């Protein structure tokens, strides 16, 4: 089974849909990013505190190494962490309203 994720960012909300075999779509999560504590690239030192605290972990990334077009970022909330793959354009759109919570390194 081939699984892909699609992200929609609007009004400080991130909607995540799962697409199975390029035909079935299901909404899996809606994140209120005003409650987000931090968003940083996977492996960033900014995430050390969150990685050591445990909590629930959800992987909504594409599952492949980063490319020039897609980068893997972790979104941290109190007690929950989400892994997503985003383009620079998508990240820049989020940074317009949430720049103080998004780290680029």
Predicted features along the sequence, with ranges:
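A short, polar/proline- and glycine-enriched secondary-structure boundary/capping micro-motif
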Residues: 18, 25-30, 94-97
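Short, surface-exposed charged micro-motifs
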Residues: 4-6
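Structured surface patches comprising rigid loops and adjacent beta-strands/short helices at the edges
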Residues: 28-49
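Membrane-cytosol interface motif
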Residues: 8-25
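Short, surface-exposed secondary-structure junctions/capping segments
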Residues: 42-50, 98-105
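Short amphipathic beta-strand/extended segments with alternating polar/hydrophobic composition
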Residues: 26-34, 82-88
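Transmembrane alpha-helices and immediately adjacent membrane-cytoplasm interface residues
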Residues: 1-2, 19
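A membrane-cytosol interface segment of integral membrane proteins
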Residues: 55-105
């Amino acid at each position: 089974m081939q699984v892909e994720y699609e992200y929609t960012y609007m009004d400080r909300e991130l909607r995540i849909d799962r697409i199975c075999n390029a035909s079935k779509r299901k909404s899996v999560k809606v994140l209120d990013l005003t409650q987000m504590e931090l968003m940083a690239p996977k492996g960033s030192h900014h995430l050390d505190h969150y990685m050591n605290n445990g909590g629930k972990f959800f992987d909504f990334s594409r599952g492949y190494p980063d490319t020039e077009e897609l980068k893997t970022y972790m979104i941290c909330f109190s007690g929950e962490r989400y892994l997503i793959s985003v383009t620079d354009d998508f990240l820049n759109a989020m940074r317009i309203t949430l720049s103080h919570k998004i780290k680029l390194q």
